[in-house]
Amino acid sequence: MSFLVENQLLALVVIMTVGLLLGRIKIFGFRLGVAAVLFVGLALSTIEPDISVPSLIYVVGLSLFVYTIGLEAGPGFFTSMKTTGLRNNALTLGAIIATTALAWALITVLNIDAASGAGMLTGALTNTPAMAAVVDALPSLIDDTGQLHLIAELPVVAYSLAYPLGVLIVILSIAIFSSVFKVDHNKEAEEAGVAVQELKGRRIRVTVADLPALENIPELLNLHVIVSRVERDGEQFIPLYGEHARIGDVLTVVGADEELNRAEKAIGELIDGDPYSNVELDYRRIFVSNTAVVGTPLSKLQPLFKDMLITRIRRGDTDLVASSDMTLQLGDRVRVVAPAEKLREATQLLGDSYKKLSDFNLLPLAAGLMIGVLVGMVEFPLPGGSSLKLGNAGGPLVVALLLGMINRTGKFVWQIPYGANLALRQLGITLFLAAIGTSAGAGFRSAISDPQSLTIIGFGALLTLFISITVLFVGHKLMKIPFGETAGILAGTQTHPAVLSYVSDASRNELPAMGYTSVYPLAMIAKILAAQTLLFLLI
């Protein structure tokens, strides 16, 4: 393998290619996915320890990965804190703290070295950034450069030993508990109001007096609908801001069937007829590519869309009913209702250009990463003279969460297109895993013949089993969280997309994704801090 030793770029792309290929192979209904890249890197560098990848590669990859996750999760994370987010995150934090305490007890009793013990915890919790944070923290604790080089391999080796069962046990736990609890995923989705429902339009004649302004009906009457058209005295028009319905008006109301039934009871009576038959008004799906309309609530955009109304937003594969507090993102596809001659103006306002979207501005991405790296360098002093910092994982993640929530600063749009986000995220984690895998090959080879390796594997599995049972039992049985959402919380607590993929395939609804996104950011930060704290307590 001398050709891989002599050419680091070739080594990197070979590891990435082989790893991604192996990650697509399904074994017992489960595939490793991008995590296979780590094991390919480990395998090659174990066979030939001189194979290496520049350390900068793993830093860049890690920062890209966590930053893009934070940007996407930011809006939903802070919004969820107003509803179920506090409950879900309390469960996650409690489970992580309890698991870290158990890890400290096991490591102390079994006399496992600190670096390996902290790496075992990160592998059991399947969190690569936390493992990287442990490696980052070692230089501040060890002065001897030669000793540091040897010890820096230990967390990576321990992580790689504990990681495989860290994924497998979580998936098996979810499957077993789902069977034991006799979970009906369809019933859960219906009760939670997240069952996949088609958006429709109905004509409702107003029979209730003193209704709120039409744009306030969803909020004040607690309805997930939007009034897209008003028919009065034989004429149909787009409701202006502040418009009130009159007795006898016919409203075209858009929403899911259940919400439309509730709207009918609150507003008036259903009448026959095609709500879209009027030739004066038309509608069109338009692609959002104009940064000028991104990140601003629809209520503030309304003056730009005179005689036009955005009624639906398709984000990813999900149709959403537009509301006044929603903001547009690059890549959204929106339905606009307007007089036919106004649709061209709507197209110009929203952009409707796939080409423009593909040429997204890299400046906000670079600036956000720069701020994140700087925040990660800030040291927080701890008792005993040591210090704690968020590092190259925590810093970009925290900053990205905030920027994702802010969305834009003046004309500076922090969000990046959905497709670009996913591509950069996949590239980032692949680069990181390839680089970190090759850095531990020599240590992994010696660990194979070391009896302590079995200790790391066994007790790492115990930690994974402990956190799985804690989250699933406490969440579903004691806190009465729907099982699909609880399983998503566990996937988010483990910060592992493969677990989420398994749960989503099994449930076929949005509950797992809701649980996952509500806890993922805080779980990522908590595990980074937990791993570093455990290391400081042990050394």
UniProtKB/Swiss-Prot annotation:
InterPro entries: AAE_transporter, RCK_C, RCK_C_sf, YidE_YbjL. GO terms for biological process: potassium ion transport. It is a multi-pass membrane protein. GO terms for molecular function: monoatomic cation transmembrane transporter activity. SUPFAM superfamilies: TrkA C-terminal domain-like. Keywords: Cell membrane, Membrane, Repeat, Transmembrane, Transmembrane helix, Transport. The chain crosses the membrane at residues 4-22, 27-46, 56-78, 90-112, 155-177, 360-382, 422-444, 453-475, 516-538. It is found in: Cell membrane. GO terms for cellular component: plasma membrane. Pfam families: Asp-Al_Ex, TrkA_C. Residues 187-269, 271-352 form the RCK C-terminal domain. Belongs to the AAE transporter (TC 2.A.81) family. This is Uncharacterized transporter Cgl2211/cg2425. It comes from Corynebacterium glutamicum (strain ATCC 13032 / DSM 20300 / JCM 1318 / BCRC 11384 / CCUG 27702 / LMG 3730 / NBRC 12168 / NCIMB 10025 / NRRL B-2784 / 534).
